[in-house]
C-alpha cells in the first residue's frame, strides 16, 4: 500500500450580505465568507490538502476563480470533484484532520453535522474526519473577526 500526506490552508474574509458556509453546512451568522464560490474555507482547505497529497497542484489550478462556471458554486461539488481527481491516480481518502480558526460563531455543536456532510460527499466514514475549532484569543484578523482560516492534514492511500 502506498500512502501520502497532504497539508492545506485557506482563509476568507468575513463580510456582510453573504451566507456563512463551513464544512458543507450553512451556519446562522451576521456575516459570511467572501469568495468566488460559496467560500467554504474548510472544504477549500481539504481540497488543497488532497490535491497536494496526490501532487496535483491546488484548488485554484483545477477550479480557477476566473472561470464563470465556479461562480457561487457549492464547495461540496468542488470537494467531490477533488476526490474524483485523486482517484484518477488511484488514490482514496484515508483520513482528514482539520482545524477551523474563528472567534465566532462557536462551532462545537456543528462539527458532527460537518463530519457527516463531508463524509457523504467523499464516500468515507465520518469517523475518518476530525474537525476541531479554535480561536486566536482575539489576536490577528481572525481575532478581530475579519476572517476565518482553516488548516487540514490528509492521508491518501492506494493499493
UniProtKB/Swiss-Prot annotation:
Keyword Metal-binding assigned: yes
EC numbers: 4.6.1.12
Pathway(s): Isoprenoid biosynthesis; isopentenyl diphosphate biosynthesis via DXP pathway; isopentenyl diphosphate from 1-deoxy-D-xylulose 5-phosphate: step 4/6
Binding site for 4-CDP-2-C-methyl-D-erythritol 2-phosphate: 10-12, 36-37, 58-60, 134-137, 141, 144
Site (Transition state stabilizer): residue numbering on this chain: 36, 135
Cofactor note: Binds 1 divalent metal cation per subunit.
Cofactor requirement: a divalent metal cation
Enzyme class: lyase
Matching InterPro entries: MECDP_synthase, MECDP_synthase_CS, MECDP_synthase_sf
UniProt keyword terms in alphabetical order: Isoprene biosynthesis, Lyase, Metal-binding
Keyword Hydrolase recorded: no
Subunit structure: Homotrimer.
Similarity field: Belongs to the IspF family.
Entry function: Involved in the biosynthesis of isopentenyl diphosphate (IPP) and dimethylallyl diphosphate (DMAPP), two major building blocks of isoprenoid compounds. Catalyzes the conversion of 4-diphosphocytidyl-2-C-methyl-D-erythritol 2-phosphate (CDP-ME2P) to 2-C-methyl-D-erythritol 2,4-cyclodiphosphate (ME-CPP) with a corresponding release of cytidine 5-monophosphate (CMP).
Protein name: 2-C-methyl-D-erythritol 2,4-cyclodiphosphate synthase
Organism: Bacteroides thetaiotaomicron (strain ATCC 29148 / DSM 2079 / JCM 5827 / CCUG 10774 / NCTC 10582 / VPI-5482 / E50)
Lineage: Bacteria, Pseudomonadati, Bacteroidota, Bacteroidia, Bacteroidales
Gene: ispF
Amino acid at each position: 500500500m502506498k500512502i501520502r500526506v497532504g497539508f492545506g490552508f485557506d482563509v476568507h474574509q468575513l463580510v456582510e450580505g453573504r451566507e456563512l458556509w463551513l464544512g458543507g453546512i450553512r451556519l446562522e451568522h451576521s456575516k459570511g465568507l467572501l469568495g468566488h464560490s460559496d467560500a467554504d474555507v474548510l472544504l477549500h482547505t481539504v481540497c488543497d490538502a488532497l490535491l497536494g497529497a496526490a501532487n496535483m497542484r491546488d484548488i485554484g489550478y483545477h477550479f480557477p476563480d476566473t472561470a464563470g462556471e465556479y461562480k457561487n458554486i457549492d464547495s461540496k461539488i468542488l470537494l467531490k470533484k477533488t476526490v474524483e481527481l485523486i482517484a484518477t491516480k488511484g488514490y482514496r481518502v484515508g483520513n482528514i484532520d482539520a482545524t477551523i480558526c474563528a472567534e465566532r460563531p462557536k462551532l462545537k455543536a456543528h462539527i458532527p453535522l460537518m463530519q457527516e456532510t463531508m463524509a457523504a460527499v467523499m464516500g468515507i466514514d465520518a469517523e475518518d474526519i476530525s474537525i476541531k475549532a479554535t480561536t486566536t484569543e482575539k489576536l490577528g484578523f481572525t481575532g478581530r473577526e475579519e476572517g476565518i482560516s482553516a488548516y487540514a492534514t490528509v492521508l491518501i492511500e492506494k493499493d
